[in-house]
Every structure is written in C-alpha cells, then in structure tokens.
From Swiss-Prot:
InterPro entries: FMRFamid-related_peptide-like. This is FMRFamide-like neuropeptides 5. The gene is flp-5. Pfam families: FARP. FMRFamides and FMRFamide-like peptides are neuropeptides. GAKFIRF-amide has an excitatory effect on dissected pharyngeal myogenic muscle system. Keywords: Amidation, Cleavage on pair of basic residues, Neuropeptide, Secreted. It comes from Caenorhabditis elegans.
Length: 92
C-alpha cells in the first residue's frame, strides 16, 4: 500500500510541475501579445477620409491648405474658417 500511495503522490507532483511549466510559457507569450496590443492601441490614429471619386487620394485634414480646392475660385477667408471649423468638429 505504501508504494502505491507514493507512486500516486509522485505522479500528482509531476503533473503539477508540468502544468506549472506550461502555464509559465503561455503567460510569457500572453505578456508579449498584450504588450504589442497595448502599443498598437496607444499609437496615434491617422485622420484620413476618402472621398468617393475614382482615383482620389486620401486627403488629410490638417492645418495645411487642402489640395482639392485648387480647381475652384478662391473663397473668402471667412468661408475657409467656417469650412475648417466644420471639419474640425466632425473629424477632430
């Protein structure tokens, strides 16, 4: 009886050690994944919008002059401020 209980105890301890090693490896992989995911989540998001015209490029709404206004007559300063204010409210 003693050898049987010793064998069962040994197998139980060996199983616990195996599970401990496996969980340590998976937690290291999880930590790497979480670190990479958090780095991606913290990265600044580009604010682009694509117009529905064929062959149109992405237009960035920033402080620079918009290139899509080139074909039109030069609007007044107040119209530009109104237009840029609306873009800022919509897209941040």
């Amino acid at each position: 009886m003693s050898s049987r209980s010793t064998t069962i105890a040994f197998l139980f301890i060996a199983t616990l050690l195996v599970f401990q090693c496996v969980s340590a490896q998976s937690s290291a992989e999880d930590a790497d994944y979480l670190e990479k995911y958090q780095r991606i989540a913290r990265a600044p998001k580009p604010k682009f919008i694509r117009f529905g015209r064929a062959g149109a490029k992405f237009i960035r709404f920033g402080r620079s002059r918009n290139t899509w206004e080139d074909g039109y007559a030069s609007p007044s300063v107040n119209e530009l401020y109104v237009k840029r204010g609306a873009k800022f409210i919509r897209f941040g």
